[in-house]
Each structure stands twice: as structure tokens, then as C-alpha cells.
């Protein structure tokens, strides 16, 4: 396994639509292993293949129990409700924005062997599914927010909300 460099906003790879995975082979397994390690090292909750320069429909995310889910060729098959909250992105380091997302999401995907499965999540996991799948179509969360905040500004906003 190896750490991969995470691309940042402005890199053209982050604006491209990713191709589906067709071969479930050792190269895919290496990519998934590297993405897992890169996500663990970064401290994030999700990572999409284009963020490491690979234009394939592959995502790794942490679920509510902090288990790592590998999603190959994922699609959202169900979404319900609405939530409004802050999110950030490893490709937009140090910046956060308020984004509307569904409060519950089910995705259908394939595992590293090509077997189909469904995974569901609510609140933060639903947010993460939506956020990461948008990367596969060349989009960043900043397209959904009117204003970006630094970590310090976000801390102040959150502290005000607790009063």
C-alpha cells in the first residue's frame, strides 16, 4: 500500500467525469488499498478516486461505526429528507461551507470483486455519500455553498450556536 497525493481545487482532474470500473483486478485492489491508507492518514471521512488523480468511479467512506466502505461504480438509489450543515473537503483544504443534503441515502455499488450490494446512511454518512459521489461527476461542494469559511471562522460559528 502507498499514500497517494490528494489533488486540490483547481486541478483539472477534479472537474472530469469518471469512467465506470469494468475490470475487477489487482490494479483496482491496489487503488482501493492505497485510497484506504490515504484516507486513514488524512483524517477525512471520505475519498474519491479523482481526488488522487484516478478518473474511475471509486469511493471509500467511513460509515457511522467508522468502518471503511469501498464503493465501486456507486449510484444513489434512494434519498429522503433534508439536512443543512457544514462540510469540508480534502481537496479544498482548510475551507468549509454550509450545504443542503438529503438526511438519508442508499447507494448501490459493487465491492472490489464486482459483487453488487447496497449501503445506507443517515445524517453525516448520507452527507458523505452525496459529497463523494459528486466528485465522480467532476463537482466539488463549493458549488453548493454561498460562502466559504476558514476553520477558525467555523469554530466561532459553532461556538455561537452552542450559546
Language-model segments: residues:
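Positively charged
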Residues: 1-163
Amino acid at each position: 500500500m502507498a499514500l497517494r497525493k490528494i489533488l486540490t481545487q483547481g486541478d483539472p482532474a477534479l472537474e472530469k467525469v469518471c469512467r465506470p470500473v469494468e475490470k475487477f483486478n489487482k490494479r483496482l485492489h491496489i487503488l482501493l488499498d492505497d485510497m484506504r491508507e490515504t484516507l486513514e492518514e488524512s483524517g477525512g471521512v471520505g475519498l474519491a478516486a479523482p481526488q488522487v488523480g484516478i478518473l474511475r468511479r471509486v469511493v471509500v467512506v467511513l460509515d457511522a461505526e467508522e468502518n471503511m466502505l469501498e464503493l465501486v461504480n456507486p449510484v444513489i438509489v434512494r434519498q429522503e429528507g433534508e439536512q443543512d450543515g457544514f462540510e469540508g473537503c480534502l481537496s479544498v483544504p482548510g475551507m468549509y461551507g454550509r450545504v443542503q443534503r438529503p438526511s438519508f441515502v442508499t447507494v448501490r455499488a459493487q465491492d472490489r470483486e464486482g459483487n453488487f450490494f447496497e449501503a445506507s446512511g443517515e445524517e453525516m454518512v448520507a452527507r458523505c455519500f452525496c459529497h463523494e459521489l459528486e466528485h465522480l461527476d467532476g463537482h466539488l461542494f463549493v458549488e453548493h455553498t454561498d460562502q466559504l469559511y476558514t476553520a477558525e471562522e467555523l469554530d466561532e460559528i459553532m461556538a455561537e450556536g452552542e450559546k
